[in-house]
Amino acid sequence: MELLKVAILFAVTAVAEIVGCYLPWLVVKQGKSAWLLLPAAVSLSLFAWLLTLHPTAAGRTYAAYGGMYIAVALVWLHVVDGVALTRWDFVGAAIALAGMSVIALQPATDT
């Protein structure tokens, strides 16, 4: 699977996980309707299913996915929570994405 496809799949997976966790947070922390727990459950189920579509062993998938999760979480922080990102956020995301790329693009025959 090429890097663009892997990156898109990781990004969609991260959004599903973040939505699935953010909605219950709204219920608990901001007193929003408990009905938000239903789409949260759907989103977390989608997240779990999306993880099965990744092209490698589960542990390696989770390790590589972590880099994309960091980047998507920072975008969420800015867009949804309205928090300005710092240069350190950008540097950290770049390092995490570089790590994701190393793990995701390693040769299949490397031991």
From Swiss-Prot:
The protein's location, in the record's own words, is: Cell inner membrane
The record's annotation in InterPro entries points to: UPF0060 (IPR003844)
Protein name in the entry = UPF0060 membrane protein Ajs_1473
Instruction: Give the UniProt keywords, A-Z.
Output: Cell inner membrane, Cell membrane, Membrane, Transmembrane, Transmembrane helix
List the Pfam families hit by this protein, alphabetically.
UPF0060
Family that this chain belongs to: Belongs to the UPF0060 family.
An annotated GO cellular component of this protein is:
plasma membrane
* Annotated source species: Acidovorax sp. (strain JS42)
Give TM segment ranges.
8-28, 33-53, 65-85, 88-108
Topology relative to the membrane = Multi-pass membrane protein
SUPFAM superfamilies listed in its UniProt record: Multidrug resistance efflux transporter EmrE (SSF103481)
